[in-house]
Amino acid sequence: MVQLADQPGRFITVEGSEGAGKSTNISVLCAALDAEGIDYYCTREPGGTAFAEEIRELLLKPREERFDNLTELLLIFAARRQHVVNVIQPRITTGQWVVCDRFTDATYAYQGSGRGLPLEWIDTLRLWVQGSLEPDITLYLDLAPEVGAARIADRELDRLEREQRAFFEAVRQGYLELASRNSRIRIIDASQNLTDVGRQVRAAIEEFLRSLSGEGH
């Protein structure tokens, strides 16, 4: 067991497109934290607070009215602001770890690469909404869109899940570009079976924990 009792709160995010297995592998990640006796809190985006969950419903509910891309972006950051100030930042400040299903990387991938909105808009909103808050490590579950679509074919799809494959191809490329520029983002091959994907997730988080245990040495 690595010695992490005196560590400050940490922020871990898990990213991935539809069908990548985020929920399953967040459970794997959390089991690794449990094994180290780490106090953590799991949350998600959009959402994480009562108000932010209402915004999530607005964002994901299928509707006939055209959803303007900038409206979508602003709603996402409105939900994120509530989440950051009421949940994420306070918990990290008190020393608790936060594990979040998606964060701002998703906005760059979906609204930036997928929707084609200017990245400068996202940069500005990110600074306004979260300041210097950034994840300490991000696990990106990479999966070809056609594989993801097949995995979720039997469930009722939300508004975003109903997008065309070209949209999800752009989202995937956006994530891969982010990973190429950010060493905190670890790419996990989510096309493998559950056991092998879980093994990758455990290896990545255990490596991260070992790196923290040596920070003060």
Residue ranges and their predicted role:
Residues 7-11:
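Pre-Walker A (Motif I) flank of P-loop NTPase domains
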Residues 14:
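Hydrophobic anchor at the beta1->P-loop junction of P-loop NTPases
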Residues 22:
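Conserved lysine of the Walker
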Residues 107-173:
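A glycine- and Lys/Arg-enriched "phosphate-lid" helix/loop adjacent to the NTP-binding pocket
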Residues 2-6, 30, 146-217:
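NTP-dependent small-molecule kinase module
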Residues 36-130, 204:
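ATP-dependent small-molecule kinase phosphotransfer cores
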Residues 19:
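Walker A (P-loop) phosphate-binding loop of P-loop NTPases
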Residues 25:
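Hydrophobic positions on the alpha1 helix immediately C-terminal to the Walker A/P-loop
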